Every structure is written in structure tokens, then in C-alpha cells.
Amino acid sequence: MPQNSKRGRMNEDIRRQIIAIIGEMKDPRLSAGLLTVMRVEAAPDLSSARVYVSMLPAQGVTAAEVVGVLRRAAGHIRSELGRRMHIRRSPELLFIEDDGSAYAAHINELIR
């Protein structure tokens, strides 16, 4: 059990730092809509981490485009993450579009 809670805290710390790093990036596509880092699932050895993001896009910007921007900036985000968290090996980041909120909105519309 202690291992899982430690990994959960590490995932949450990584998520918070990624949110801060993305917030400082200057790409207008990232600030065009509402971008949310939903969760992070890091490997036990921190070799990689899946970052699930949700996006309510603005006009002219698609969620796939935003995920593409994040994937291209993954190297920068990874190096900044390692610097801020003072970890020896920062995980390789894989950004994945989390469509859970879009699915929930769709179900909500069907119920109404």
C-alpha cells in the first residue's frame, strides 16, 4: 500500500508541474480553449508517463491540434519537469487526448 500512495503522490506532483509548465508556454493554440491535464500515469521506474489531457477547443483550434502541439513540446516539458522536481531521470511524456469529459457531455445531452 505505501508504494501505491507514493506513486499516487508522484503522479499528482508531475501533473501539477506539467500544468504550470504548459501555463507558461507562449503558443496561442494552448491558451485558445480550456485545456485541462486530467491525470498522469507514470511507470513505477519513472521511465515514461502517460499524460491525459482534455480540451474544450475555441474556434479554429481542434483538440487534436492541441495534443499535437503538446507532443512536439514534450522534450521541453520533460526537461523543465526534471529541473523543477529535482529528479534524476524525468519520464518520457506521452500526451493522450482524454475524451471522458466529451463523452460525459454527450450523455448529459442525451438525458436532457
Map each language-model feature to its residues.
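Charge-rich, low-complexity N-terminal segments
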Residues: 1-48, 54-112
